[in-house]
Amino acid sequence: MSDDTEWSEDILNRLNVRDQYEKKDSRYFKAFSQLSQEARTNDQASNNDKSIEYNKLLKENNQLKKDNEILTTSLNQTTISLEKSDLKINQLLKSQDQLERHNTSLNNKIKHLNLEIIEKNKSVEILNDELLLNEIQTNVLNDKITRLSDENKKLVERWIEKAKSDAEKLNDANEFLESVNRK
């Protein structure tokens, strides 16, 4: 918003400078008009041909003044248009600079995120390798537990069989001793 007010103030200041500059020359135009009027009155008295030439010059002078005013107006409009264009260019350059900085920032962020993804992928690979190793170890341990359970079961069965056998032998020995003691 301040750029618009600065721009408007700048235009008004330039127009004031131009108007002051033209006002300096207005006394010359007035002096010229007075001289031309004096010349006309002198010429009318002395010579009618000079009067025609004077009128011609006066018309030409008036036409030149009108042309000058038209050119001045056109110059002012062109100056205003040029200043608007300059302002727009400056705004676009600022916007472009901001966008370039934002783009650079986003590119840096993308690079950092890509590096982070690479590191996370490495970590995931390591975790997958460790998980696979743990699964292998678990399978080996489960196999060992199964084998040891089977072996333990067989040992218990063998021990029970041996205990049965020993108990039967003991029973037989006790029966024998009892039968010997009875006799």
Swiss-Prot record:
Entry's Gene Ontology cellular component terms: phagophore assembly site membrane
Gene Ontology BP annotations: autophagy; protein transport
Main location: membrane
Localisation per UniProt entry: Preautophagosomal structure membrane
Coiled-coil stretches noted in the UniProt entry, renumbered to this chain: 44-183
Disulfide bond residue pairs: none
InterPro entries for the chain: Autophagy-rel_prot_16_dom
Complex formation: Homodimer. Part of the ATG5-ATG12/ATG16 complex. Several units of each may be present in this complex.
Function as written in the Swiss-Prot or TrEMBL entry: Stabilizes the ATG5-ATG12 conjugate which is necessary for autophagy. The ATG5-ATG12/ATG16 complex is required for efficient promotion of ATG8-conjugation to phosphatidylethanolamine and ATG8 localization to the pre-autophagosomal structure (PAS). Also recruits ATG3 to the PAS. Involved in endoplasmic reticulum-specific autophagic process and is essential for the survival of cells subjected to severe ER stress.
Record family assignment: Belongs to the ATG16 family.
Name recorded for this polypeptide: Autophagy protein 16
Originating organism: Debaryomyces hansenii (strain ATCC 36239 / CBS 767 / BCRC 21394 / JCM 1990 / NBRC 0083 / IGC 2968) (Yeast)
